[in-house]
Each structure stands twice: as structure tokens, then as C-alpha cells.
Amino acid sequence: MKKCLFPLSVLAVIVATGCGNTSPYANDSYEKHANAPTFTTIDTAGIRIIGQNDTYLLPATNVKKGENMDIRPPAIPMAIIGNSVAQFDGERASIIYPSEKAEVYNIRQMARLLEERSIKFTTKDNQIETDWTNFGAKTDQGETLLRYQINQVGNQEANALVVSVLEAKRDDILFTPSQKEKERYTSSLLNQFIGELNADYRSQAQAVATPTTTGPVQTAIITDGNNHLALAMSSEFQQSWSKLGDALPQLGFETEEETVGRGYRKLNYKPLGATEWARLGVNRPELEDGEYSMQISAHGKQSSVVISDEDGNAISGDAAQAMYRALANLISK
């Protein structure tokens, strides 16, 4: 009996001790009850915001509302032709560039870009006057329409393209644009068109560097936007350049110099005999011998060519008809 009483008494003491010291929460850190952290219930939900400190508050003042600001990027003429100068004189935006670049940047090319945008215009010599268009004023409030004037001026050393606003109307009411508006309108047109001519120049130069496309070329004698007779071709610039280079010598034109990127050739003409023209199926054109030039204009996958005399005047009349028919017969083979 003594052997059984001792273990039972010890077990009773352990059980009693364990029941007397039961904690209301688990304590797995073996801390003493007095040192264990206690938790309290949050009385209010969320975060308590401290009030604003008015120490540095600015005094209230009556501030007058200013005029609405035009946050659009400023439009100024940009000199994006090599060795050029661009400016706005208060009425006109212009870009002045070396005369040797006039075969790329000229009134004919400006007319072509207007045609591509379906902007109607009239032309006389080196001046263009457009019909009403919202070009350059699409972001204005209301319906703003403008009529532009584009001029090409120059001498042996330099040329310039000049853009001005002839008339302006907003919601069918004529108004006089402010100087800032004139600068924005004229600069937008000038920068956009010159930028596109730059892109055309680069694409033509790149096209000539690639292998020539072969295949038949369809042709037609047309009147271009400058009222000049021209030969239209169903071929891209590269193929037209190559075809014309082969055909022109057969008509008596010798190439003195050429600028591929501009689509320009300077030519010297010596008339062929009547027999040679008869073989081409046309009558001999009444053209004087001397200096001429050839200018290709690219129109996407099509192109056109104009031949001009040494004064820059496009050949016309029966002489132009005969010359372009002969060219068409040669390049369509």
C-alpha cells in the first residue's frame, strides 16, 4: 500500500497546481504571467485625423481670373531644310534655302501636296491661292476656315517659300486673326509641307538604291495642278527614273547632271532627224536645241514627269504632246 500512495499524492498536487494557474490566453513564449503583454479593445474604428495647423495658412485674397491660356505647343517656322533660315515677320512665315535645292522645294511641289489633301486652289506663275480650308486650324474653337497664299521667290543664290493668310472666318463670320494666330496658321502649313517634301526626298533616294522593278508601264498625257502638260506613269519613282534615263537619250536628250533624291536631271537637247522621229511614230517636235530639265514627282505607286526649258517654263502645246507621246512609246515597252 505504501508503494501506491506516493505516486497518487504527487499526481494530485500536480493536477491541483495546473488548475490553479490557468491563464486566460495561451502563452507559448514561456514568459511569466506578470510579464506577458495585455491587449485592450479598440473603442473607435479607423484612424483619428489630427486637425489642420493654420500656422502657415496663406491669407485669403481676391484674385482676378486671367485670360484663358493657349497651352498648345508654339508653332513657329522651323529651318528643317539644310542650310536654311526660317522666320515669321508678323504676317508671313517663310523659309529661305540655297537655290540648288529649288528642284525639291518649289511651288509645284506645294501644289501637289495641296492636291493630295483635296484642297482646291488657283495658281499663277509662282503664286498659289487656296480655297477655304481648316488646315492649321482644326484645334480652334468653332469652325475656323482659312484661305492661304503661297509664294516662291528667289534669285541665283537663294530661294524662299512664303505662306500668308489671305482671309479667315469662324462660324461663317469673317475675322482678323491675331499675330499669334497668323504665326500658328502659316507655320503649321509651312512646317508640315516642308517636312513631307523632306520625307519624299529620302524615300526617293532610298528607292533608287534598291533593285529596279520591272514590268510594263502604262502612261497618259495629263495636265497637272500647275496647268502644265505632264506624262503620268503607272510606275513608282524608282522604275520611272530608270525608264526615263534609258528613253531620253533616244530622243536627243543628253544628261549633263542629275540628282536622284530630287528626281531631277539637267539635260542638253540636240534635235533628231525627221526619219528618226518617224520611226518613233510621231512628228518631229518644234523644240529649240539647248538646255532643258526633267522633274519627276512621285505620287505613291505612280509618278509623273515634266520637261522644262532653261528658263524653268514647262514645254507646252504640240511640241509637248509629241515629246511625251514619244517618251510613252519608249518607256511602255
UniProtKB/Swiss-Prot annotation:
Belongs to the BamC family. Part of the outer membrane protein assembly complex, which is involved in assembly and insertion of beta-barrel proteins into the outer membrane. GO terms for biological process: Gram-negative-bacterium-type cell outer membrane assembly; protein insertion into membrane. It holds the Pfam family Lipoprotein_18. Part of the Bam complex. The keyword Signal applies. HAMAP family: OM_assembly_BamC. It comes from Actinobacillus succinogenes (strain ATCC 55618 / DSM 22257 / CCUG 43843 / 130Z). Gene3D superfamilies: 3.30.530.50, Outer membrane protein assembly factor BamC. The lineage of its organism: Bacteria, Pseudomonadati, Pseudomonadota, Gammaproteobacteria, Pasteurellales. This is Outer membrane protein assembly factor BamC. It is found in: Cell outer membrane. It is a lipid-anchor. The keyword S-adenosyl-L-methionine does not apply.
